[in-house]
Structure formats: structure tokens, C-alpha cells
Amino acid sequence: FSYLPPLTDEQISKQVDYILANSWTPCLEFAASDQAYAGNDNCIRMGPVASTYQDNRYWTMWKLPMFGCTDGSQVLSEIQACTKAFPDAYIRLVCFDANRQVQISGFLVHRPPSATDYRLPADRQV
């Protein structure tokens, strides 16, 4: 999912500040570790579209988008609540631009303790 090491609360808060400064709306999504990656077992192929195209890759939204969010501490509080409710799930923060009606960015804020997908840069190989 990410080549970055886990983000600290301070780093997440700075990202939220940037999101809010651009008038975007933060939102949390989560997925069980066996459903987080797109694959044949958890996706629906949509007819004769491109052979590798898979649909139904959506994660579950945690509550509603945070329309009234004013600072990073509010998002951190929701991350903690989501982690407490779903400790073995991946959790990502995404943000939406209401003017363009698109998702602007997304990144992991919680990797489950059972996850084995992250490797330190020294341990990676191509």
C-alpha cells in the first residue's frame, strides 16, 4: 500500500491542515486486511471491459465525511475511534474536492498489526 513508513500523529495532522487549507473534506475509510487489496477473490469483474479492470474496490466509510472539520486533532480522534473499533483493518484518510466532485488524495493512517506488506527500505528488492 505504501512505500512510506507509518506516519506519526504530527505528520497526519500536517496533512489534514493542508487538506483543510485547500477547502477539501477529509474522510476515513477502512477495510479488513483480506479485503484491502484489489484481487479476484474480493472484486467483481464488470463484463467485457479491459481484462485487468476490476470494480467494487471500495472501502467502507467510517461515519460520514468530516464536513465541519477545522483541525487535525478532530481527524486524529476519529482515527483512534476507528482503530479501536476495527484494530485489524487498514485505515486510510481520503479527501474530496466538492467543486470538482472528485477524490483528491488518500493515504494510509493505520496498518493492522498482522500486516506483513510493509518492508523497511533496506529490506526491499525489485
From Swiss-Prot:
Keywords, sorted A to Z: Calvin cycle, Carbon dioxide fixation, Chloroplast, Photorespiration, Photosynthesis, Plastid
Gene3D superfamilies, sorted: Ribulose bisphosphate carboxylase, small subunit
One of the Pfam families matching this protein, by short name: RuBisCO_small
Domain of life: Eukaryota
GO cellular component: a single term: chloroplast
Subcellular location: Plastid, Chloroplast
CDD domains: RuBisCO_small
Record carries keyword Chloroplast: yes
SUPFAM superfamilies: RuBisCO, small subunit
GO biological process: one example: photorespiration
Miscellaneous information on this protein: The basic functional RuBisCO is composed of a large chain homodimer in a 'head-to-tail' conformation. In form I RuBisCO this homodimer is arranged in a barrel-like tetramer with the small subunits forming a tetrameric 'cap' on each end of the 'barrel'.
UniProt subunit comment: Heterohexadecamer of 8 large and 8 small subunits.
Function per UniProt: RuBisCO catalyzes two reactions: the carboxylation of D-ribulose 1,5-bisphosphate, the primary event in carbon dioxide fixation, as well as the oxidative fragmentation of the pentose substrate. Both reactions occur simultaneously and in competition at the same active site. Although the small subunit is not catalytic it is essential for maximal activity.
Record family assignment: Belongs to the RuBisCO small chain family.
Protein name: Ribulose bisphosphate carboxylase small subunit, chloroplastic 1
Lineage of origin: Eukaryota, Viridiplantae, Chlorophyta, Ulvophyceae, TCBD clade
Gene name as annotated: RBCS1
